[in-house]
Amino acid sequence: MTVTILKFGGSNFLGPEGYDRVARHLAQRRAAGENKIVAVVSAMKGETDSLKAQMLAVNKKASPSNLDAALAIGEMKSVCLLEAAVSRLGISVASLNGYSLGIRTNSDFGRATVKSVDPRRIRSALQEHDVVIAAGAQAIDQSGRLTFLGRNASDLTAVVIASMLGEHACEIYSDVPGVSTGDPNIIPEALLIPEIGYQAIAEMSRYGAKVLHHGAVEYAERHAVTIMCKSLTNDGVVTGTTVTGHGNARSVTVARDAVVISFASVAERDNRRALLDQNGITTIDVDQNDRPGLCVMSDTDFAMRLVEGTGISIGSTMVVTVLDASVRRVHLIGDYERAVSLARQLHEQMYPGAVAERLGRG
């Protein structure tokens, strides 16, 4: 049984019409001969932040397991809405969430790590139905408790499902068609990268690029899953970037939600850095108000929980990074407008003809 694996990010679901559009796309894929489809979905845009805010309003010290269970509601709601939209088109459809997907993790709530998979439940659903809607970014631990795989980790769910079903490709749909040399929302001159290697895009993700989750890319590399980045528009599907074992590109990334964690001593910083490194979290050594610190650009909630303790202070910042095959330059900027301005300047230095090239294409 050949299965098509698709993942739709929250930007596809700005309202009820988004679910209708995705459902129609699934119907078109089936009409084109793709009989079995798994569609992994994220929560509606802004839903996860809203759920977290509600939880913390009730209890600022809510347990990590309690938070994970609450955050999973966003994807579960999205699954129900898409299942309803697909069912209305007369397609046989079922849905699975973290409890039933067959993905087991450790108990690192907030950013759990996949430990084992069991494809029997999802294979059974595909035997009975033509489309299976799967909740992204969630699984269960060995005790059967819901776990959250991390922010934007629905990509990881899609890659894991592709691998566990023996498929070697999955499609990721977001509001941009692919990976670019910079965020096109803030750098209009950014150039689309047709093909890029796993390690290159994983590094971009760790330094702030939002197109793909770094954990998904790393899992895809280990299990030989090709990722195709696409965008679903009113005019159809736009294919942008294929992520495989080959390809590199210079880029400028902007991490808008980075945090700076300051410590009482250099020794304490070094100890906490080692802990974060063990958990695969990229950090940069910084000095903040004459105190040694670490800047964290991804998995920030999980990182802050790992290093929490007395004598620690936390602040926010933005990080602009130039990524090159031989050079990595990092700039910490406190103001968003200045960060965007710097990113555009650095991109222009990196690709001096980009503006003219885009105008020429237009």
Q: Which sequence ranges carry the predicted segments?
A:
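Short linear loop/turn motifs
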Residues: 100-104, 233-238, 288-291
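A conserved active-site cap/scaffold subdomain adjacent to cofactor or substrate pockets
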Residues: 202-256
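Conserved dinucleotide-binding and phosphotransfer motif residues
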Residues: 89, 223, 279
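Generic beta-strand/beta-sheet core signal
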Residues: 135, 173, 230, 284-286, ...
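A conserved regulatory-domain signal marking ACT and ACT-like small-molecule sensing domains
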Residues: 241-362
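A residue-level signal for beta-strand positions that form part of recognition/binding surfaces
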Residues: 131, 224, 258-260
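Nucleotide/pyrophosphate-binding catalytic subdomain
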Residues: 1-217, 264, 306, 315-317, ...
